[in-house]
Amino acid sequence: MGSPRREPGRRANEQQRDVEFKRGFYMGVTEVSNAQFRKFKPEHRSGIVGNHTLDLDNQPVVAITWMEAALYCNWLSEQEGLPPAYEKKGETLVAVNPMTKGYRLPTDAEWEWVARYEGGGKLRRYPWGDSLPVTPRSGNYADETARLIVQDVIPDYDDGFAATAPVGKFPANNLGLQDLGGNVAEWVTDYYIVTADIGQTLVDPLGPTDGKQHVIRGASWKHSGVTDLRLSARDFGEGARNDVGFRIARYAD
């Protein structure tokens, strides 16, 4: 995980570290859609930006907190008779440790590995490859059609969507997953910290045991800069945003 110190656009929270996955896991091919989320919370509305709706059934759900995403995962586990992946701790939810086979958000490490995987021990820098410019129609980023609703756009890039696109609209990566680097950024399970356990191999890491904010992964329809477009970039937050959604994951055994 992480990026080299001299990589253009690198942030201080991207320290390189070794991770080992001993438990196999599944991950959603696409981000959770409004239609899927409204089966859990029928009244939810993802809103609008400018004159562009974010609320169509096939668009990714946004305007949700980390806790709402975690509650959706627990609800989905209940529908399938699986143990919950999150439990109450005071006024919040925390990941069960050791983690169950219930539905959950991907971990920070899982998300980055799946997003960057190229095979043969190689990890890609951007969703489309290792260099700029952005490959045409490779994902939904801040493009020319978004000039009226975002401050900065990618010059001469047009993905056809000013805001969110329908889930699964763009090409899949090497593992068959879509929109890991575009459309909406995504909540993951881990609490956010700047520093990492450098010098040791982390095995199936779930992140810190407590904190105030959670990690957000991936670029969104709002992003155009080299820092955010890279797959090693890490953001954080807790409250709802109109460019942050999520996808589901769970352990295979």
Residue ranges and their predicted role:
Residues 1-48, 60-77, 182, 248:
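A short glycine-rich, aromatic-capped structural motif
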Residues 4, 24, 131, 221, ...:
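Short loop segments at secondary-structure junctions
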Residues 13-19, 210, 238-240:
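A generic structural micro-feature
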Residues 16, 24, 213, 226, ...:
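Structural motif
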Residues 17-20, 52-53, 159-160:
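Short, flexible turn/loop "capping" segments at secondary-structure junctions
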Residues 52-60:
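Short coil/turn segments at secondary-structure junctions
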Residues 55, 66-234, 238:
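Functional-site microenvironments in short loops/helix caps that host divalent-cation chemistry
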Residues 242-253:
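Short, structured beta-strand segments at or near domain termini in extracellular proteins/domains
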